């Protein structure tokens, strides 16, 4: 048995699978069950009661986490002229147009998010098949197709996350690092969950939040009580 398997098993026995934890309890337990030596990412997985094959039940959104993600995102911006200068001043990691598109077509993908001014989208469409499957395609719905590139870059650098329901009706998003204290993790969880709840499709019937788990990278899933939709930092 590998050391990582042993560490996972040791962590997993600390989680009572029959219990539904509060967000604060889950955050604390996630820190305790992190089975890597590195500062693990803390993630949330939610099973929604929607039919994601239907356009009117697509759940997709963004939220600015109050305490950030613990990682400074690398941002690429598609812009020219004054907007390109503004993007550079705002802290974008790479800015360009045709040159940036050619670089990406050549296999370069060393960025975590992409922003584009509206006039660049016809060009960016040429690499949609590269960016789309990786969740990197700029989109007006997530605020990443905008003339206000400074705000878009600042939001992403400040801890803005995107989420989108997949074909199996699951959502996945990051709420921080294992080095965060549990209150900060719980507050980030609360901010994200409130946005997920706000986006509930009117056509969705039955229970909306079917299952919620919190975990660290390589750590066991910790079941969270899906009925807790406020007072996230209470035990």
Curated annotation (Swiss-Prot):
Disulfide bonds: none annotated. InterPro entries: Ribosom_uL1_bac-type, Ribosomal_uL1, Ribosomal_uL1-like, Ribosomal_uL1/biogenesis, Ribosomal_uL1_3-a/b-sand, Ribosomal_uL1_CS. One of its GO terms (cellular component) is large ribosomal subunit. GO terms for molecular function: rRNA binding; structural constituent of ribosome; tRNA binding. GO terms for biological process: regulation of translation; translation. It comes from the Bacteria. Keywords: Repressor, Ribonucleoprotein, Ribosomal protein, RNA-binding, rRNA-binding, Translation regulation, tRNA-binding. Transmembrane segments: none annotated. Binds directly to 23S rRNA. The L1 stalk is quite mobile in the ribosome, and is involved in E site tRNA release. Belongs to the universal ribosomal protein uL1 family. HAMAP family: Ribosomal_uL1_B. Part of the 50S ribosomal subunit. This is Large ribosomal subunit protein uL1. The gene is rplA.
